[in-house]
């Protein structure tokens, strides 16, 4: 509330805010209850190029669970987090940075599956002819990226590591489709993004740094994951166990036959359809990621290690950095409260 409002208006406005918040919470609770009774789920996904898009296309999750599954495409991790918080979706895909921010803000979610270890699948690209050849050259220039995303986090990390004050760079909050439009118009000098947008900007740009290089240099790694609303998870244990098995089988099928995932294959055609990528670029895009097998995810290094796990430590480091930047106001003492290995530990 603005301090210019008169004090006598505050009780009424505060009560209205409380009532509105209560109504929103009740609506989300009722929505969750309705989903529980009807065996329905809404899954928010993004445009990451990952193997399980083929399972989305074939309806594999529906076949194995008997649930009605609705997929809702969202434009950024921040949108996914807001949808989880409101109850509009029960499960969502996002990067480690949005989930770190969500947990720091008290959103009741649990990370339960690592979609990918990002490695070189996200990159900072400068436009050809921009005169940008190093991170130092970004001073005073415009970078387009989605705020509170893994690329936002790594852009800030990379700039600081290079001795560049992020405030000396114009960082614009753009979702991938908006990045492509701004790139085509010449409104931005650089972008930090993932495929399919990454493949398109590479055609007229130069890679300055990848997430894998930044992680190797700074020790701050990033990943994409799936998280579930805690209230939904309590009521749908068997569904989540089968969902994780679908995810594991999708990754295994790709890893065992990478050569078969050609541009003309039904698998790659499905990935292209669900993400908006060009089929010809999908095989190379998939190769940039590392897909972590369920046995490794279940172990102490990833989801199963409690506070000392890679996931909890990465979430904590990301949240601490976001707090320094003013993106979040507080950090949790232990981010393993937002990590649940139970379902991946039962996967085969």
Residue ranges, per PLM feature:
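N-terminal secretory signal peptides and thylakoid transit peptides that target proteins
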Residues: 8-25
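Short, glycine-/small- and polar/acidic-enriched structural segments
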Residues: 37-178, 189-195, 211-212
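Pocket-lining segment of extracytoplasmic ligand-binding domains
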Residues: 178-276
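Secondary-structure end/capping motifs
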Residues: 234-324
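N-terminal signal peptide c-region/cleavage motif recognized by signal peptidases
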Residues: 31-33
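Conserved C-terminal helix/tail region of periplasmic/extracytoplasmic solute-binding proteins
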Residues: 311-348
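Helix N-cap/coil-helix junction residues
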Residues: 107, 164, 277, 327-328
